[in-house]
Amino acid sequence: MLITTTPFIEGRPVQEYKGAIYAQSILGANVVLDLLAAIRDFIGGHSKSYERVLARAREDAMKNLIKEAEKLGANAILAVDLDYNTVGPQGSMMMVSVSGTAVVL
């Protein structure tokens, strides 16, 4: 599956548009990670714990997006867009939303 953030691929014309596709991944962040992140943010370090959680959520969302494209018979996803949000009580969960256009090249 070819995946790109651009709306087209030079030299690879779109043969068929299959449609817009969407996927999400929501992961909870536990209290210990929140505390460690707050301490690291306070002293100016990076929060590796949050980075790992976000990377996992992004990977899950992308896998789900690929599955949606495959269901439609696409071999590429164009114009991929990722958005990050917090959801739940007091932003206790992280959500990655991803969208794109499923196509046949």
Swiss-Prot record:
Gene3D superfamilies xrefs: Hypothetical protein apc22750. Chain B
UniProt cross-references to PANTHER family, sorted A to Z: UPF0145 PROTEIN YBJQ
Family recorded in the similarity comment: Belongs to the UPF0145 family.
Record-given protein name: UPF0145 protein CCNA_02462
Organism from which the protein derives: Caulobacter vibrioides (strain NA1000 / CB15N) (Caulobacter crescentus)
